[in-house]
Amino acid sequence: MKTYVSEFPMEVSIPNYEKVNFGCAVAELRLRPKAEVDDEWMALSSILGDKDIDVCTFKGREDTRLVQVLNDMGFKFISTFYTLSLDRTDFMETTHENIALRVEEATDADIERVYDIERGVFDYSTYQMDDRLSADKMSERNVRRVASYVGKPNNHIFLIKRDSAILGFIQFLYDDDIAHAVNGAIVRSLQDQFVGSLMYSGAFKSIFNTGITTITSGVSAQNIRALRIHQACGFKIIDAEIHLRWIRK
């Protein structure tokens, strides 16, 4: 973790600071919800002054004054992201007549195929990046992010399969009685063919059968397909935040 402290009595943490290996550094920034705009401006100025950082992502509550400050500093809006939550008692299972599809937890032998799926479906256009952050480069960054959880005891990856073919995956981190969905993807050719709905529903059912009581997930407001899948299973939107990104010129 890399931490910056401004002149004001507030601390800014970057939990996912990563110097990626394609000539660019990425800092994902999250500020305290009740921080004053002037505090945030000072903290951001300190971060953007770090010559090791070429890209900075701001995540936080939407605030007109703060957004104007960020725009003046060169940040551009990416998307609104929703936090969704599902309690076990509200879960609605999705069913389909295609019994050839099944959901099961991944083994070590499946991980390379999971990486291949992540590479194949990455859509960099939602990130509004320049040439330094191409689709291939950002795809590899996402693969490394998926891989960083593998091997940890609270990491669980569920797959949807047809026979031996892996068609998609969804990854969770368990925290006591809560499971957090951190990533998921379906092979591009099978999107809009009910595969995603069955995978998510099957994974949620398996998780709740372990004693987990709540599942949380984050979805971009632009990803209408994913929102519909979550809401069909009973998820409710409980929070929203905006993501803006700055790129060093």
Per-range role (PLM):
Residues 36-46, 183-186, 192-207, 228-232:
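Conserved acetyl-CoA-binding loop-helix of GNAT-fold acetyltransferases
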Residues 52-53, 147-158, 180:
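A short helix-loop-beta-strand connector motif used in the catalytic cores of GNAT acetyltransferases and
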Residues 57-66, 187, 217-227, 245-248:
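Conserved beta-strand-loop-alpha-helix junction that forms the acyl-donor binding cleft
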Residues 63-77, 197, 221-239:
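Conserved active-site alpha-helix within GNAT-family acetyltransferase domains
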Residues 102-118, 122-125:
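A short beta-loop-alpha structural element at the N-terminal edge
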Residues 154-170:
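Conserved beta-hairpin
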